[in-house]
Amino acid sequence: MSKLGVLLTICLLLFPLTALPMDGDQSVDRPAERMQDDISSEQHPLFNQKRRCCRWPCPRKIDGEYCGCCLG
């Protein structure tokens, strides 16, 4: 049992729980920063000014979702 305690202590010293991302660290909780990082449709490099849209199908996804330009 003491070996298990030593192993647990070593693991907690090497990987403290504070190093793990918590729910409060997610970008969802910081909308102001999200808005600064967000690119509007008109400024998107694939946005066609004449057609007012991107070419379809969407050439790329951001975090598994379509870019804002393609969603219109």
Curated annotation (Swiss-Prot):
Shows a paralytic effect in fish. Pfam families: Conotoxin. Expressed by the venom duct. Residues 1-19 form the signal peptide. The keyword Signal applies. The cysteine framework is III (CC-C-C-CC). Classified in the M-1 branch, since 1 residue stands between the fourth and the fifth cysteine residues. It is found in: Secreted. The modification Leucine amide is found at L71. Its main location: secreted. One of its GO terms (molecular function) is ion channel inhibitor activity. Found in injectable (milked) (IV) venom. The keyword Mitochondrion does not apply. This is Conotoxin CnIIID. Disulfide bonds join C53-C69, C54-C67, C58-C70.
